[in-house]
Amino acid sequence: MRCRQRRAQLLSYFAGRTKRISLGTAVIVLPWHDPVRVAEEIALLDVLCGGRCVFGFGRGAASVEYEGFRIPMEEARPRFVEAAQIVVKALSNDSFEHEGRFFQIPRTAIRPRPISRPERRFYASAVSPDSAEIMAKLGFGILMVMQNEWPKAAEDIARYRAIATEAGHSPRPPIILTNVCCAESREEAHERAFKYLGLKWQSIDTHYHFSDGHLATVKGYESYGKMAKTYAKINASAEAKTKATDFYVSIQIVGTPSDCLDKIAELQRCTGMDHLVAEFSFGGLPHEEAEVNMRLFADKVLPVLQRDPAFAVPEMPERTVAGTERDNIFAPA
């Protein structure tokens, strides 16, 4: 059994240690938590970091974690939707009440009040088409983990945008999460990526048990049946695992600094993303190698992303508010 730490608690440390960098959660799994407590943690973190945090949510897909929290996995989808609605309601109103299937909340108010509008920076993980539809209808931005060919990801994003628009929301550009392996030579980058992304791929299956197909029978997770078939084929032979790892490496940001820039530009063109979450440490990659990976990217790739107009993107909405509004954040309800 393995349970995850509270994201806002960890980020409060970084909020106190930094002044300018953006912070973010990926992800808060809402079905595991009391939504009023989540809203309070978000509000306090918003105060501590000065409106610098982007909040990512998800519904989770690991049965071992649901068992640890003693929550039926079949309730994940309706619990997520109801909890998400409560969190938004709590942060966007001076006081609120709620009567639902899972939560009955008498009129209450969140203190401290957030100093910005964090609910306008809500994103949610969309690994499956079902999740993308839920997030679109809620009006959340989409946080997409790159596990498909980029044109397929673009199709999923277009579908999300269409559903969000139909639901009366203005869809935001997606945030893309990808692994990055940057090295001085393509050979070195690919060798490192193949080894450690392959191990990451295996660890994902070990944790989520995708290959055994159990999720296909869980209400709300039926679409994961296709994933089970894919993993079963991968695990059938060493050759299949090699091909699968090659494919996984091909859809990440892997190569020399120049290659990384070209791939990020293509990913931005294909998906319309305005923010990239780069994972530099994966699959047991030794800390020293992860640091070299990150520093090379920071030295050779990041400066170009920062100064080249082709990569320019707008700021996240509603980051800060006037100082006078800060004075009342701890006022009693």
List the predicted regions and their residue ranges.
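Acidic (Asp/Glu)-rich catalytic clusters
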Residues: 11-22, 42-52, 133-137, 161-169, ...
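Conserved, mostly hydrophobic/aromatic
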Residues: 14, 45, 87, 122, ...
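An alpha-helical appendage that flanks or caps ligand/catalytic pockets
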Residues: 76-110, 151-273, 302, 306-333
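A conserved active-site cap/scaffold subdomain adjacent to cofactor or substrate pockets
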Residues: 128, 136-144, 148, 157
